Amino acid sequence: MENGALQQGEGKDPSSFLSEIIGSKVIVKLNNSLVFKGELQSVDGYMNIALEKCEEWVHGKKKTVHGDAFVRGNNVMYISADESA
């Protein structure tokens, strides 16, 4: 941290980051390596996630298109904003 400037992502807690990206495209990676890409509709304190316009990706290839998907929080490895969208 040079000259007191904050670096990208520094100073934010995860819940504030997640509340800021509701309605945005996200990437959700699960503990079993499955990846879901879609529009984040909600997330709760247990990391349970609701996605719309959801796609399931396996080994980098789109496998299935889902309308809505609900992911149980204990299966989530990470949630990331989808910069490619």
UniProtKB/Swiss-Prot annotation:
Superkingdom per UniProt: Eukaryota
Compartments (UniProt record): Cytoplasm; Nucleus
One family name in Pfam for this protein: LSM
Keyword annotations: Cytoplasm, mRNA processing, mRNA splicing, Nucleus, Ribonucleoprotein, RNA-binding, rRNA processing, Spliceosome, tRNA processing
Gene Ontology CC entries for this record: Lsm1-7-Pat1 complex; nucleolus; P-body; sno(s)RNA-containing ribonucleoprotein complex; spliceosomal complex; U4/U6 x U5 tri-snRNP complex; U6 snRNP
GO terms classed as biological process: deadenylation-dependent decapping of nuclear-transcribed mRNA; maturation of SSU-rRNA; mRNA splicing, via spliceosome; tRNA processing
Entry-linked InterPro entries: Lsm6/sSmF (IPR016487), LSM_dom_sf (IPR010920), Sm (IPR047575), Sm_dom_euk/arc (IPR001163)
Annotated Sm domain residues: 13-85
Molecular functions (GO terms): RNA binding
Its biological purpose: Component of LSm protein complexes, which are involved in RNA processing and may function in a chaperone-like manner, facilitating the efficient association of RNA processing factors with their substrates. Component of the cytoplasmic LSM1-LSM7 complex, which is thought to be involved in mRNA degradation by activating the decapping step in the 5'-to-3' mRNA decay pathway. Component of the nuclear LSM2-LSM8 complex, which is involved in splicing of nuclear mRNAs.
Complexes and interactors: Component of the heptameric LSM1-LSM7 complex, which consists of lsm1, lsm2, lsm3, lsm4, lsm5, lsm6 and lsm7. Component of the heptameric LSM2-LSM8 complex, which consists of lsm2, lsm3, lsm4, lsm5, lsm6, lsm7 and lsm8. The LSm subunits form a seven-membered ring structure with a doughnut shape.
Similarity-based family: Belongs to the snRNP Sm proteins family. SmF/LSm6 subfamily.
Protein name as catalogued: U6 snRNA-associated Sm-like protein LSm6
